[in-house]
Amino acid sequence: MLDFDLLKDCYGCGACVNVCPRGAVHMTQAADGSYIPEIDEARCIGCGRCDRVCIHQHADKNHTPLGKEGCYAAYQLDTQARKASASGGMFFPLAQEMLRQGGYVCGCVWNEQMDAVHIVSNKLEDVERMRSSKYVQSDIGNCLATVRGLLKAGKPVMFCGTPCQCAACAAVTGNPENLLLVALICEGAPTAGVWQRYRDAKAAQYGEKIRNVNFRSKTPVGWTMPYFVLTTESGKRHQEMSYRQNPYVLAMLQGLTYRQSCYHCEFKGDNGSAD
């Protein structure tokens, strides 16, 4: 059961957690802060479902050769709506259309503790929280099982995440026609532990909790000079130029804080699994 080097090769995608019939698999944080599965041997019945959906063990089955299919570039035409997003803003109109069709959206939000987590919702206010980049690996929780249940009930669902998370969603659900997979263009995900230590250090420095973060704010300059903005509980904003001054973003761009599987990712580039 998941008999390989988890710290080196696991993607922390949560597919195994979402298919275990006995709840014997849960995610824990490794020493580097990355999510890896831990199996409760007392509850495990050896059914092998975790191995069958493991995207690392079956990486060759989850690839969509983008180079052969071709692709299009697009961006949100509404200037104000685009400002609320980190890049071209295409997630939001796709999600809005899914809601108009009576469907659900699964995406990443900040929870009350300012941890990145995936949620499933058909409410516009939740979808608005999913906008903008979160430069940290999210906790997928039980979302994949929830998505599978909705798909089986005939509901259309849009799932948005990293390429490895999209592969996990496809593996758990069987990738039916009513599932729309939307992948980020990913260069690697900093571990949750790294973000949590940075967040807590800044909260201690400012003397109050962090309530919001924008890694690529288009205020005050715009697209060409994004700012890293932390907002504390009192509403005060603390900002630095993302690519020149902020140590968290700079460490990420230099590839210093990724989970280990990111350095030999089997799903990036043309090896994606999204629509």
What name fits each language-model region?
Residues 1, 15-37, 134-137, 229-247:
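Short, charged low-complexity linear segments at domain edges
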Residues 1-7, 38-42, 245-253:
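Short, intrinsically disordered, charge-biased short linear motifs at domain edges
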Residues 2-3, 9-11, 15-32, 36-38, ...:
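Iron-sulfur cluster-binding cysteine motifs and their immediate structural context
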Residues 41, 47, 120-121:
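Glycine-rich loop at the start of a catalytic domain that most often binds anionic cofactors/ligands
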Residues 58-275:
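Iron-sulfur-associated redox domains of electron-transfer enzymes in respiratory
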